[in-house]
Amino acid sequence: MGSFIYKQLLTNSYTVELSDEIDAIGSEKTQNVTINPGPFAQTGYAPVEWGAGETNDSTTIEPVLDGPYQPTRFNPEIGYWILLAPETQGIVLETTNTTNKWFATILIEQDVVAESRTYTIFGKTESIQAENTSQTEWKFIDIIKTTQDGTYSQYGPLVLSTKLYGVMKYGGRLYAYIGHTPNATPGHYTIANYDTMEMSIFCEFYIMPRSQEAQCTEYINSGLPPIQNTRNIVPLSLSSRSIKYQKAQVNEDIIISKTSLWKEMQYNIDIIIRFKFNNSIIKSGGLGYKWLEIAFKPANYQYNYIRDGENITAHTTCSVNGVNEFSYNGGSLPTDFAISRYEVIKENSYVYVDYWDDSQAFRNMVYVRSLAANLNTVICNGGDYSFQVPVGQWPVMSGGAVSLQSAGVTLSTQFTDFVSLNSLRFRFSLAVESPPFSITRTRVSNLYGLPAANPNGGRDFYEILGRFSLISLVPSNDDYQTPIMNSVTVRQDLDRQLGELRDEFNALSQQIAMSQLIDLALLPLDMFSMFSGIKGSIDVARSMATKVMKKFRNSKLASSVSTLTDSLSDAASSLSRTSTIRSIGSSASAWTNISSQVDDVISSTSEISTQTSTISRRLRVKEIATQTEGMNFDDISAAVLKAKIDRSTQIDSNTLPDIVTEASEKFIPNRAYRVMDGDEVLEASTDGKFFAYKVETFDEVPFDVQKFADLVTDSPVISAIIDFKTLKNLNDNYGITKAQAFNLLRSDPRVLREFINQENPIIRNRIEQLILQCKL
């Protein structure tokens, strides 16, 4: 829309596309989201890219289907199915107890007429009768002899299309599948000394625990899962199941590498983590039956323990994240028991424990890699909390439990009252446990989780045993310490100062009367327009943000807002677009003639409010005198205004930050502009919405783009403080005169204050929405 409008203009000087400027400013905006886990649990460092990241849980989960493995000879463990998956016919399995049982399994392909075949079994050539009458299915047969030189007898068979065969040693027997799919089931052979029998397997195979026998039967009858049928699965050697053990000391400090100034140290350390929860219980006023809040709070805990004969002093900070909020309301009477909000941690929550001790590992915990930890699980049980109401039996909240499982470890920084500590943050995920919690004498019962009422359950602390390891880059001289503490403290102090400034600014906005807030909302709207094309001024304002908030609170600007906006309105109404303006050919001369109309204001520039009025009048001239022959209001702001301000003796570099704060691009970012043609108004916003309507009835009419473009070049352009929807709502519910409508369309601050003083909810709500954007 913006580019189409300006294409209609005669542009023989510097031009700026409004839509491009809006997009550019919008792309530079950032939104800060603050996560506050507690004043003593701020994370100062994120995990480095070359760190270990998440640590795996130490629990070993036995797979359902382990394999495939390459053909081999081994003694299978008792109670495990060996699932054979041969590709071709022939001998697939041999096993013997070397005394009275020689056992082998043969696979016969489809459609085989009875014939004698020669196989090599246990190193000897044997003739075995082979037959398979099925046209589509394969056949496994078991052959057994009882003496080394005896003859084989056939048993089984197993007929199926999946070409799978299962065998297992268990309970003094050798189990093997027999029958016909889909009803194949395990059969068995009694064999002495079965536990010492080794098996020679001549095809790929899998291993399954006996507990998964039902799944094994399903595979025999229906086939392996699809992932096992791909040719990308490569069988491994059975030796890959072996575990290589390495002996290591419990606590180690190992030098990995060393240069002249730095060395890498690997620390393998056992730790004892003790922590406790803290809470805040706030009772409401009144008769004593209402509770306002029961919430978790960060808790510090310091303790000592012995590690390898050394007395260790440790410090932990426990905080929670992702709490669940509950409430209970027993009724509307003042004597009805009620809790407005109480917090519960459940399976969607996390517990953070920041750990530090006085050992060598934590002295230089700055440049760290290969960070890993293994911790035990702990169960946290809630205790009882009695709500002491004035009369009657006390309701009691009791029960609740969660288990904490280690979910990772990162670096962090703890800020105590005296020092900042580089520490480790252990993150724990939660699972709900029994018993559930309830509140006696209420409907609250059988809810799972750990409530904040008594999360420690009368214990002094919870304890977790574990071990962590890391590699740290430290100075070669052990007496030196990595100089990081000061910079951390400076950053923390700066954050606190900025937070205080924001709080002061927001508190100020709440203290100013509503009428002044209206004026305050109008002022940055004009400031935004003035500086929208002057990047340098905005950069100055950004760099002076904190200075602005300090000065703004103590200056006369807040008390002079009403006078200032009155002067804005006067400047706008007194301006006449004469033929002299139209005949001007250069931007500079146009500015000179326009500025001469406000010379009466320039004489007094001692106060910030007067200087602001001077700029604002020039600004309003810029907005009203939109398009002349050869220039538009963006041309004035970009090509002329900055040069004039830079040369002005009344406006210096220290005044600009006082007027244009970092909020100059945040106040009312969704701008809307309107032009008026008689009793018809055309309105277009920066987000692409547009309206056309009659002033008297506020009935919408078709929006004529060409007419809007022509009016922009030849009519005043007004910033739309009260938008079309608000005006129409006001007219439909209260009715307004034509004069009031025109004043609202012109954003006359006097008229706006009149509506506010009359407690008009529609205008008040609109202004409050704009003011909400003024908060930092």
UniProtKB/Swiss-Prot annotation:
Spell out the disulfide connections: 203-216, 318-380
Residue stretches in coiled coil: 491-511
Region annotated Spike body and stalk (antigen domain) sits at 248-479
Q: Does the keyword Plastid apply?
A: no
Q: The motif YGL motif: which residues? A: 448-450
Q: Where is this motif: DGE motif?
A: 308-310
Q: Which InterPro entries match?
A: ConA-like_dom_sf, Rota_A_VP4, Rota_VP4_MID, Rota_VP4_MID_sf, VP4_concanavalin-like, VP4_helical
- Region span, Hydrophobic: 389-409
Q: Which SUPFAM superfamilies match?
A: Concanavalin A-like lectins/glucanases (SSF49899), VP4 membrane interaction domain (SSF111379)
Chain location of the short sequence motif KID motif per the record: 644-646
Q: Which family does it belong to?
A: Belongs to the rotavirus VP4 family.
Full protein name: Outer capsid protein VP4
